[in-house]
From Swiss-Prot:
Source organism: Salmonella typhimurium (strain LT2 / SGSC1412 / ATCC 700720)
Domain of life, source organism: Bacteria
Pfam families: Kdo (PF06293)
Catalytic residues of the enzyme: 162
Annotated pathway: Bacterial outer membrane biogenesis; LPS core biosynthesis
Job description of the protein: Kinase involved in the biosynthesis of the core oligosaccharide region of lipopolysaccharide (LPS). Catalyzes the phosphorylation of heptose I (HepI), the first heptose added to the Kdo2-lipid A module.
Catalytic reactions on record: an L-alpha-D-Hep-(1->3)-L-alpha-D-Hep-(1->5)-[alpha-Kdo-(2->4)]-alpha-Kdo-(2->6)-lipid A + ATP = an L-alpha-D-Hep-(1->3)-4-O-phospho-L-alpha-D-Hep-(1->5)-[alpha-Kdo-(2->4)]-alpha-Kdo-(2->6)-lipid A + ADP + H(+)
Observed effect of gene inactivation: Mutant shows an almost total lack of phosphate groups in the core oligosaccharide part. Mutant is significantly more sensitive to polymyxin and shows a complete loss of virulence in mouse infection models.
GO biological process: lipopolysaccharide core region biosynthetic process
An example Gene Ontology molecular-function term: kinase activity
Similarity remark: Belongs to the protein kinase superfamily. KdkA/RfaP family.
UniProt KW keywords: ATP-binding, Kinase, Lipopolysaccharide biosynthesis, Magnesium, Nucleotide-binding, Transferase
Record protein name field: Lipopolysaccharide core heptose(I) kinase WaaP
Amino acid sequence: MVELKAPLTTLWRGKDAFEEVKTLQGEVFRELETRRTLRFELDGKSYFLKWHKGTSLKEIVKNLISLRMPVLGADREWHAIHRLHELGVDTMHGVGFGEKGVNPLTRTSFIITEDLTPTISLEDYCADWAVNPPDAQVKWMIIKRVATMVRKMHAGGINHRDCYICHFLLHLPFTGREEDLKISVIDLHRAQIRQHVPLRWRDKDLIGLYFSSMNIGLTQRDIFRFMREYFSLPLREILQKESGLIHQADVKAARIKERTIRKNL
């Protein structure tokens, strides 16, 4: 199965897309046993390629023991991108997808997306907020936009599984005006798509977002602002209904922080 969009429909017409993918050269961003991420140029534009080369039995068993679905190919990200566009959530633009093989251990697949440039991750954009606070209106504007994006994503049946601020890209130039604000969510290769997002997975995304923004100087008021936008309810009602999530977020964020510190020792 192969799906191509412009310019690949023209450049690769009559050719084997899998053979063309093998010849692509560029900057390697990640090289794993079963996955390769490459940035390359084609016809004067920059793109990203994710090349999946099956998986190992060890990886499948490890994920199943952890009650997680292993990433078996590029199809999950391809479908998530299209679903987010349907929901009105800014994300990558997919221009190519291919998959062949039935056996998950040997299945080969690829996805090609446009390089979102110029952009900066929110992790980098907000890195010095704790010491150099931004204009309050700009901060609240970004908080509101991220909350709206995640709300739409979850309402549309998608949970990210790696929902951290480093996976939200702010498009540049950004002047501080709302009409210039565009944020795209990326790295959807582990995303899950269902009719409804289970509470457990909704909470995992929200906790990941909370943890990844702990060091950028957000106040309790900022967090409440996010919650009001995400849940679309009065704060008092949110605090009553979501007390379990709030407690879980504090406990899990502290646990993740401890684990991160131990890994860096």
